Each structure stands twice: as structure tokens, then as C-alpha cells.
Amino acid sequence: MLRSVWNFLKRHKKKCIFLGTVLGGVYILGKYGQKKIREIQEREAAEYIAQARRQYHFESNQRTCNMTVLSMLPTLREALMQQLNSESLTALLKNRPSNKLEIWEDLKIISFTRSIVAVYSTCMLVVLLRVQLNIIGGYIYLDNAAVGKNGTTILAPPDVQQQYLSSIQHLLGDGLTELITVIKQAVQKILGSVSLKHSLSLLDLEQKLKEIRNLVEQHKSSSWINKDGSKSLLCHYMMPDEETPLAVQACGLSPRDITTIKLLNETRDMLESPDFSTVLNTCLNRGFSRLLDNMAEFFRPTEQDLQHGNSMNSLSSVSLPLAKIIPIVNGQIHSVCSETPSHFVQDLLTMEQVKDFAANVYEAFSTPQQLEK
């Protein structure tokens, strides 16, 4: 039996060698293919896990953004009420002073200024914090992903994070003061000559707010000239035009200072982008729309109006004397700058444009390839 097999192999030696080579090649290719498939599967699994981890970190970061905004609103409200103290004027009016008309005129300007500044500053706070916390969030994600790797440098240590995020104080300090000045001038120009007895409908109020917005947003200090000659909406109030005090020092900067300056410059680039201006403008449109919605309940038709079958547009069918509108406007700050999630703040925090913009910022700063560009 063995001899006959051996004779067969000798007679078909070349064929057997060829067949053995083919079978061996198929076996090796099969093993190689299995290895490659396993490597691809492992790589895809690792990428999926990394993507899921990054998505989880992003969503957690957005919750942090929302909580940070809500936690800072009382500080913003207090700063506004301190600089635009209408309560002191209201207290004076209760004593029936001889200059009552003059005080009412001051109250008119301060009340409108305060509510309009509240809308602007709250919108700025929401969008600016989205930028800052997603930039720093991207760096933190990369730092966490690099834990355990040799030769890696922490991109955003805690002290840098604290120093960088403290730059929000410009919006709550000097930036807010400048914004108040500009808006107060615009309010004075549009409403200064309007009599307290003059009646305004909700539609009239909307038109007045549009006129004030146009003056504010076209003001020379409200537009930031970018490197390409374009203008960024209201960025001046969120970050100072001049170099940061750290950069002015020129020498003697610590590694922490250098990293902080890098983060601030990256933030500045984001604020100069067309996307930022678009998102901020969308927030402002929503904010002023919500402000009017809040006041609309005071302009509801009376039963007498309804009995007369008033078919006019509800926005213009009811008018109130300006003197009665002032207290309504004056109280809006408590809704706009409420740390308890109100419809106003919730609208801003849940806007799709804000979410998409935040995702783009986070994507840019949580991807190593993007940071290397």
C-alpha cells in the first residue's frame, strides 16, 4: 500500500509539488486574511469605543456648560441691578417728590436699558461659555486619552484651566459696563422723546426694540474688526481688544502663562468666526422674541374688547401708556437672568444652532490631527 502511494508520488512529482505549494499558499493566505480581519475588527472596536467615550465626554461637558451658565446668572443679575438701580428710583417715587416727572424719565431709560442689556449679556454668556468650555473640554479629553503614555505632556493642567476660564470676568466687568453705556445711549435716542402718556402696542414695542438693536449693533465699539477686514458681532464686550496682560509682559512668562495665552488666542479666533456671529445673532433674535412673549400677557384684550369683536391683529389691538409699560419692562430681568431654568434661558441652552456649534468646537479641539494644523 505504502509502496503504491510512493510510486504514485514519484510518477506525479511535479503535480504534487505544485498542489502542495498551492495548498500551502492558500493556508498561509487564509491565516494572513484571518489576522487582518481580526486587526480590522479590533481597530473598529477601539474606534467605536473611543468615539463612544468622546461622545459621552461631550454630552457631559454640555451639561457642565448648562450648569455653569445657570450658576453665573445671579452674578450677572446682581451686577446689572447694581449698575442700573431702578429700585432706588421706584422708592423715591413712593414719597411723591416734586421732581416726579424727572424721576419717571430716568426710570424709563434705566428700565429699558436693564432689560435689553440682560438679553444681550445672557446670550453672550451662553455662547461664550459654550466656546470656552468646549475648547477646554477638548483638551481635557485628549489629556485623559493620553494617560499612561510615555512622553506625553498635559495640554491643559488644572491651574491653566482656572486661569483661562477666569477670562469670563471681562464680560461680567468692563465688558458689561461698556455694553450698558452703548445700550443706554441707544435707548435714550429711541425712547427719550416718547411721552410717558403715549400709548404703545406690543407691535410698537417690537419696532422700538429693533431700532435700539440696530443702533447698538452698528455702534463702532460693538463690532470687532477681524484680520480679514470683516466684523464680528459684539465680541468687544466678551474679550478685550488689546493684548492680554499676560502677553504684554513679553518676557518672564511661565509655561502656564504661555498655554493660557494660546487658549485665549484660540478663543479669539472662534469669536472672530462667521459661525460665532451667526449663532450669537440667532440667540439674540430668540432672546428678544422671548422677551416680547413675556410681556405679551400684559397686552391681552379685555372682555370689553372681545365683546366688540375686535378683529385687529392682537399685537396691535391693545395699547398701554408708556408709564404702565415701564414696570413691566423693569421686572423682566428676573425672568431673563433667572438661575432657575426659565423659558428664556432654556430656549437659549437647547437651541439646535447652539448645540451644533458646540459640537463643532469640541470636535476641533478633541482631535489631535486638528490641533496640529
UniProtKB/Swiss-Prot annotation:
Residues on Peroxisomal side: 37-116
Keyword terms, alphabetized: Membrane, Peroxisome, Peroxisome biogenesis, Transmembrane, Transmembrane helix
Keyword check for Transmembrane: yes
Chain segments carrying region Targeting to peroxisomes: 1-45
Subcellular location field: Peroxisome membrane
GO biological process per UniProt: peroxisome organization; protein import into peroxisome membrane
GO molecular function: lipid binding; protein-macromolecule adaptor activity
Topological category with respect to the lipid bilayer: Multi-pass membrane protein
Cytoplasmic side: 1-15, 141-373
Transmembrane segment boundaries: 16-36, 117-140
Keyword Membrane included in the entry's annotation: yes
Superkingdom field: Eukaryota
Major subcellular location class: membrane
Gene Ontology cellular component annotations, sorted alphabetically: endoplasmic reticulum; nucleoplasm; peroxisomal membrane; peroxisome; protein-lipid complex
Protein family per UniProt: Belongs to the peroxin-3 family.
Function text: Involved in peroxisome biosynthesis and integrity. Assembles membrane vesicles before the matrix proteins are translocated. As a docking factor for PEX19, is necessary for the import of peroxisomal membrane proteins in the peroxisomes.
Name of this protein: Peroxisomal biogenesis factor 3
Organism: Macaca fascicularis (Crab-eating macaque)
Gene that encodes it: PEX3
